[in-house]
Amino acid sequence: MIRVFIDPQLLIFKMSGHSEFGPVGSDIVCAAATMLASTLVHNMTTRLDESQILERELNSGHAVLKVMPIRRKMRDECRVLFAATLEGFELLAKRYPEHVIID
């Protein structure tokens, strides 16, 4: 099961586990979760200076992202992107509740 924690206010994202929905390399739930996580990490790394990325890890079965934008406007933009990612994971969890859980 994939477990996800996202706090759009604190700008923290954590994901762990495997969905075990299908065979490795053909698992659509895992692919969807990976794309959501990868898109969030990409958006943060292209918008923020390295000094504002407190933690970043994206591996098979594990992802962590913590950011602290300095400017208020950028913080607000990041919160929107974190919230959109949370919404994506909520939709995925609704469709595949045995394979994705939001903490």
Regions found by a protein language model. Name each.
Residues 29, 33:
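Short, conserved glycine- and acidic-residue-centered signature motifs
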Residues 1-28, 41-103:
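N-terminal intrinsically disordered, cationic/polar leader segments
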